[in-house]
Amino acid sequence: MQSQNIRIRLKAFDYRVLDASTQEIVNTAKRTGAQVRGPIPLPNKIEKFTVLRGPHIDKKSRDQWEIRTHKRLLDIVDPTPQTVDALMKLDLAAGVDVEIKV
């Protein structure tokens, strides 16, 4: 019989908030008796934007901005019902996007 896995993918702009949320999920899963694989750091997505500084002329004067999206992957192997309940009740930081696949 095939074991059931829960794959959790986290995304955030701030890596410190992301790492804290990841550690909170790992601690919750281990406390309820599940085995955790990860966190696996995935490649960062870097979006760069170049805008003109002035509203009129002077094309040589520009600002460059970038947004870095940090990602982590967690696998929870053979989760118990207590693990699923604890993860559903878990309250994470506001800046973290969570995707869950069963």
From Swiss-Prot:
Gene3D superfamilies: Ribosomal protein S10 domain. Keywords: Ribonucleoprotein, Ribosomal protein. The keyword Ribonucleoprotein applies. Pfam families: Ribosomal_S10. Part of the 30S ribosomal subunit. NCBIfam families: PRK00596.1, rpsJ_bact. This is Small ribosomal subunit protein uS10. It comes from Paracoccus denitrificans (strain Pd 1222). The lineage of its organism: Bacteria, Pseudomonadati, Pseudomonadota, Alphaproteobacteria, Rhodobacterales. The gene is rpsJ.
